[in-house]
């Protein structure tokens, strides 16, 4: 999880490359949550078959940042009415309502759909704010489908735009960053394989590194989902983005001491 207020250590590292005056007033973590439900028929136990949708958005109290959030909804913030109307019009909902009676006649349980479109303020420093966008859809398969996006915005700008990782990296440092992330990913895979029971042997470490190199070669995939963290820079990967579903979606953190000369 993001720290509410990121530490000065990382901020100073970034500010060395981007020394600008920015507001330091606190931001609000208030979040508006809108929920909708659409019911159609009943199941074998005479319980309503309902589909649900959740939409959230933050109100930071900063006009420019809140305007940026509004733009993510095409200029108009959602309302209870609009969320309900969108769920009612959803083509997947209509199709599922048609299929459920047939499935129940076969003795199968009905499908109850779930949707989520959630924006939130993840954290901030005096110079930057990090927004999080989580989407989720469960359509009655073996598992749901989720996705996370992170957006780092420069505070103080009238029309803020997401800061790209390349904007804070020093020249020719991408490969070094990739190697640091790869090393942390190897540690992550070893930890989940051993479930923290004991230290990995040198042989296990070499085998895991060989497995990762077989997938990525000499490089490594650097995600656009990065954020400032109290310990350094953290890169969040979606489930399955680097490997199998079972390997999960790791959060790889490069500590401040290793960022020297990179940002």
Predicted regions and their residues:
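Hydrophobic h-region of N-terminal signal peptides that target proteins for export
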Residues: 10-19
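Sec-dependent signal peptide recognition
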Residues: 1-8
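Compositionally biased intrinsically disordered regions enriched in Thr/Gly
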Residues: 20-263
